Each structure stands twice: as C-alpha cells, then as structure tokens.
C-alpha cells in the first residue's frame, strides 16, 4: 500500500530520478487526495525537483495550524521542515522543528507512561506485590 509507494518515491529521488518521482507521486496523489502519505511523498519529490511553489501549496493543504503537530500530520510537518530548509527560510524551519521536538517529547512521555506505568498505578513503593 502506501508504505511501499512512499518507499518507491524515496528510491526514485535517491537515484536522482526527480522528474520520475514527481510524476509517480502526482499520479498517486491524484488517486488518493486525502492520503497524507501520498501528499507527503509528493512534497518530497517536488522539493527534489525544486518545484517549491507546488510543494508549499500541498503543505498548506494538510497543515492548517503550524503550531499543532499530531500523529495524523507529523510526516507532513517533517516534509514542511525540509521544504523551509530548502528555500532558505531558517525562521520558519526553526519554528516547525521546535513544534516537532515538542511533539516527540509528548510521544516519548506517552510511551514511557505506557511501558513503565504512571505513578498513579495504585501501588505504594513499600507494598509491591513481588516483595
């Protein structure tokens, strides 16, 4: 599915076949207009082909609030960061990187709570069931 198509577009870019990557991603995105993976792959391909205006339009289509990175739009935030780096907008790139870093810290906290449990698990340190 989408993962395989995303990888194919990345391989095309890595091989320097930017126009082919753009064409592939364009067709994929046109078939799946709501698919953020298709859109993100397309943004990366457009950046590789230096088609910055089209890349920016796609980014704004999927990122409405640049201060809110969520699980659903994280990959587009990463593409947007790369886009702003490519066009030399250091301020905007730094802003998005900060939001991404905050999101990563949030995810790390969630994982930590899930794996280690929170302090509110009902056990006092001195009354653990395995002591």
Question: Where is each model-derived feature located?
Answer:
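Canonical positions in the second alpha-helix
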Residues: 27-28, 62, 66, 100
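Structural motif corresponding to the intra-repeat A-B loop/turn of tetratricopeptide repeats
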Residues: 15, 49, 86-87
């Amino acid at each position: 599915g989408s993962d395989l198509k995303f990888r194919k577009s990345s391989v095309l870019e890595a091989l320097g076949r930017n126009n082919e990557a753009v064409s592939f991603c364009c067709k994929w995105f046109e078939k799946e207009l709501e698919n953020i993976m298709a859109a993100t792959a397309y943004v990366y391909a457009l950046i590789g082909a230096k088609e910055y205006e089209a890349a920016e339009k796609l980014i704004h289509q999927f990122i409405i609030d640049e201060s809110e990175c969520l699980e659903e739009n994280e990959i587009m935030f990463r593409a947007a960061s790369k886009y702003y780096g490519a066009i030399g907008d250091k301020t905007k790139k730094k802003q998005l990187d900060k939001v991404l870093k905050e999101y990563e810290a949030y995810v790390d906290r969630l994982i930590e709570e899930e794996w280690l449990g929170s302090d509110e698990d009902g056990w006092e340190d001195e009354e653990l069931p395995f002591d």
